[in-house]
Swiss-Prot record:
It comes from Arabidopsis thaliana. Residues 61-126 bind DNA. It comes from the Eukaryota. The lineage of its organism: Eukaryota, Viridiplantae, Streptophyta, Embryophyta, Tracheophyta. It is found in: Nucleus. Transmembrane segments: none annotated. Residues 20-55 are annotated as: Disordered. Residues 20-38 have a biased composition (Basic and acidic residues). GO terms for molecular function: DNA-binding transcription factor activity; RNA polymerase II cis-regulatory region sequence-specific DNA binding; transcription cis-regulatory region binding. The gene is WRKY75. Keywords: DNA-binding, Nucleus, Transcription, Transcription regulation. This is Probable WRKY transcription factor 75.
Length: 145
């Protein structure tokens, strides 16, 4: 890819932001409501639900599903506003693992697939992928939605 130092395995990781708790303003308590991007939710209720970290990868690919070494079961698909490509929803098939992922193409660049993972796998990788390093060289990582 253009603009990357091919000598570094981590060169394509343009940005990685870790999920952080919303900041509370002076005088607010943790159970108070926090307004974020047009919707409000209780900080306390997101703790009870056990909100998981989310990571998004942008990859240039002709196929929507990249082999990441885990096995996935598709459980849904929906049309998304302002995007002609549907978003697909998957769950890890390993018993007791609650990791989910969403896959969708970008409208502005149809060759880019955005894969968003929610959670951390509770088991080792199920199958080795020979092309995993090739996938890593094409990825951009984003986090915190």
């Amino acid at each position: 890819m253009e603009g990357y130092d091919n000598g570094s395995l981590y060169a394509p990781f343009l940005s990685l932001k870790s999920h952080s708790k919303p900041e509370l303003h002076q005088g607010e308590e943790e159970s108070s409501k926090v307004r974020s991007e047009g919707c409000s939710k209780s900080v306390e209720s997101s703790k009870k639900k056990g909100k998981k970290q989310r990571y998004a990868f942008q990859t240039r690919s002709q196929v929507d599903i990249l082999d990441d070494g885990y096995r996935w079961r598709k459980y849904g698909q929906k049309a998304v506003k302002n995007n002609k490509f549907p978003r697909s929803y998957y769950r890890c098939t390993y018993g007791g693992c609650n990791v989910k992922k969403q896959v969708q193409r970008l409208t502005v660049d149809q060759e880019v697939v955005v894969t968003t993972y929610e959670g951390v796998h509770s088991h080792p990788i199920e199958k080795s992928t020979e092309n995993f390093e090739h996938i890593l060289t094409q990825m951009q990582i984003y986090s915190s939605f």
